[in-house]
């Protein structure tokens, strides 16, 4: 199977990327190989320390004032928000149900985050009623700063293309966490913060 990419300025269509590995090794058929493969899959499906860390966030979180910037030169709008976090599928995935308002309209979001033990990355998918696309991000947790940083792409219908998106979750010693969201700025080059809020557990 060949991996292809479309080169800039190539009007004849996609070209083969010769630098990308093109062969997938066959699955083992001998008993030892099959046993090793099954063991690898069992390990892949077993929650690890990263999943236990995600489970610590299970519960209901609230924010009195989520800031939202449509125009960075103007003051942000604010809205309250609620985040309900649960674990599912034997503790492999963290499910988030988010509710707030955006631009005066009710906003509902649904996220699923896991830790891919093969990639050794946190992986996230996100959907909400503000659009029909699925946002996918992945990233790492920095224990020294207590920050989970994830980045990916989102559909931008205004530009008719995918643009960068980035999320930071910074966990504080008082048990709260701050969520910050960043995207491509109006100039198409710089990064712009478009959402930020500090959440606390609902008592």
Model-derived regions: residue spans:
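Central antiparallel beta-sheet cores of small beta-barrel/beta-sandwich binding domains
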Residues: 63-166
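Edge beta-strand at a domain terminus
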Residues: 3, 171, 181-203
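Residue-level detector of short, conserved catalytic/binding motifs and their immediate flanks
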Residues: 59, 111, 197
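Intrinsically disordered, low-complexity sequence elements enriched in Ser/Thr/Gly/Pro
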Residues: 3, 9, 16, 130-134, ...
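Exposed beta-strand face motif in extracellular beta-rich ectodomains
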Residues: 175-177
